[in-house]
Amino acid sequence: MNLAISIALLLTVLQVSRGQKVTSLTACLVDQSLRLDCRHENTTSSPIQYEFSLTRETKKHVLFGTVGVPEHTYRSRTNFTSKYNMKVLYLSAFTXKDEGTYTCXLHHSGHSPPISSQNVTVLRDKLVKCEGISLLAQNTSWLXLLLLSLSLLQATDFMSL
């Protein structure tokens, strides 16, 4: 009986590990706020446990999540939204003091080691504005529709001068 329980538990852990995966982590600037987009897969029925953190000078600072306890200095500066396969964290009043390696990690439950994570190194002078990223990454269907519409208008000779 113990062998059957062990095998069932192992299969459950493997299924959750395979079904929950961070696919990308991007950073950009919205006004004076840092925006982190953590895209992930979730093909299991298990709830996603997650954590956003910043590593600066080898020290990890938890910003937001369901796993670690966010540090007091970041609590009032963070704003979080979640969609089906994306978690978005905003860090307001972003300055050069907030530069470092940001991590989005998925966990099984509690304080277990992450099953999947992605890092992005953020330097204030190297950050791009979010508008360009969101147009290409999130609104690809509108861009394709625009290109198809222009081709259709050109084919019907609507745009000829």
From Swiss-Prot:
It comes from the Eukaryota. A lipid is attached at residue 130 (GPI-anchor amidated cysteine). Residues 1-19 form the signal peptide. May play a role in cell-cell or cell-ligand interactions during synaptogenesis and other events in the brain. This is Thy-1 membrane glycoprotein. Residues 131-161 form a propeptide. Glycans are attached at residues 42, 79, 119, 139. It comes from Macaca mulatta (Rhesus macaque). Disulfide bonds join 28-130, 38-104. One of its GO terms (molecular function) is GTPase activator activity. The modification Phosphoserine is found at residue 82. GO terms for cellular component: dendrite; external side of plasma membrane; growth cone; membrane raft; plasma membrane. Pfam families: ig (PF00047). InterPro entries: Ig-like_dom, Ig-like_dom_sf, Ig-like_fold, Ig_V-set, Immunoglobulin_dom, THY1. The modification Pyrrolidone carboxylic acid is found at residue 20.
